[in-house]
Amino acid sequence: MRNWRWLLLVLAVLLAWLQYRFWFGPGNSGEVMMLEAQVAHQTQDNEGLRQRNQALAAEVKDLKDGEAAIEERARSELGMIKPGETFYRVVEDAPLPAPASPEAPAPPQQAPEPIDPVDHP
């Protein structure tokens, strides 16, 4: 019976030591959760960068292989036109200010201040 008590005491101490290491020791559960969150955030960042890289790779391939992409870029970014083409630019009129309604009072006018003459010797 006495051996059982010692065995139970040793197992309780071992369990307490393992619990301490789980909650407070190196590599504890808090650190693991923090690292898992960092990994999830980095995975999300990597996916965004992977999509960006794929788009850039497709654009580079298109620029290397096709003339249509080069022509489009020259037209849109550099304003170039083909020989014999006429370029028309449509400029929209700026909206006119709304006329003052007759019910609204006109803003008060300030009279200009008189200028003091300065005597120069």
Curated annotation (Swiss-Prot):
Organism domain of life: Bacteria
Disordered: annotated span: 92-121
Signal sequence extent: none
InterPro entries: Cell_div_FtsB, FtsL/DivIC
Chain coiled-coil ranges: 31-66
Record keywords: Cell cycle, Cell division, Cell inner membrane, Cell membrane, Coiled coil, Membrane, Transmembrane, Transmembrane helix
TM region(s), chain numbering: 7-24
GO cellular component: cell division site; cell septum; plasma membrane
Biased composition (Pro residues): 96-115
Gene Ontology biological process terms from the UniProt entry: FtsZ-dependent cytokinesis
Parts of the chain on the Cytoplasmic side: 1-6
Topology in the lipid bilayer: Single-pass type II membrane protein
Subunit structure: Part of a complex composed of FtsB, FtsL and FtsQ.
Role played: Essential cell division protein. May link together the upstream cell division proteins, which are predominantly cytoplasmic, with the downstream cell division proteins, which are predominantly periplasmic.
Family statement: Belongs to the FtsB family.
Record-given protein name: Cell division protein FtsB
